[in-house]
Amino acid sequence: MRILNIKAICWRIFNMKIQIELASNKKAKPEATTLGFGKYFTDHMFILDYTEGKGWHDPRIVPYQPITLDPASKVFHYGQTVFEGLKAYVTEANEVLLFRPQSNFKRLNLSNERLCIPEIDEELALEALKQLITIDREWIPNAPGTSLYIRPFIIATDSYLSVAPSQTYQFMIILSPVGSYYAGGINPVKILVEQQYVRAVAGGTGEAKTGGNYASSLKGQELANADGFDQT
């Protein structure tokens, strides 16, 4: 998917009332050789709030910044959170391309359903993503093996400790210029078939992209790395 021209995007975003606050101070951009994976972040982020009875509201693009959460927020205690991951690339013709981003937002909603999180408007999410990338376009690296990693995610923000679905959430999108996920680049990786520590069982949350699934994989991954494997 090509990123649409900025005038068209701005018109559509304006009709959806996404507020835009541009960063007054731009960050220095890292060299392509130092990128690694997920260490650096662009100048802006997208935020959308949810309140029970009001729905999703106040979509906005703002300068990248820390967020403030109550220590009792449900995301910390019960892991009610979902996320996605996709990339944007620059072609030799200087076009910005996305690969089936609508499928990522569709999958995000499937994860939402499993974690009792309200469904997001996939068209709004896609338009917000396009606008965010347009604003931070200069952050997309063009060296071989590099790209702009896109991380959409939702967190439960209610600040009480009963085990129940939250009534408030935040949906955010952040961007990170990246190199290869593995130190060896695009070369083959050594994979261990883990038989003791698992992240998915029948009836569980394995089909959802939720933080707890990845936390449960860390032990097996740690042991595999110690034995010289790259992944489990």
Please provide the spans of the model-predicted regions.
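Short, Lys/Arg-enriched N-terminal segments with co-localized hydrophobic residues
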Residues: 1-15
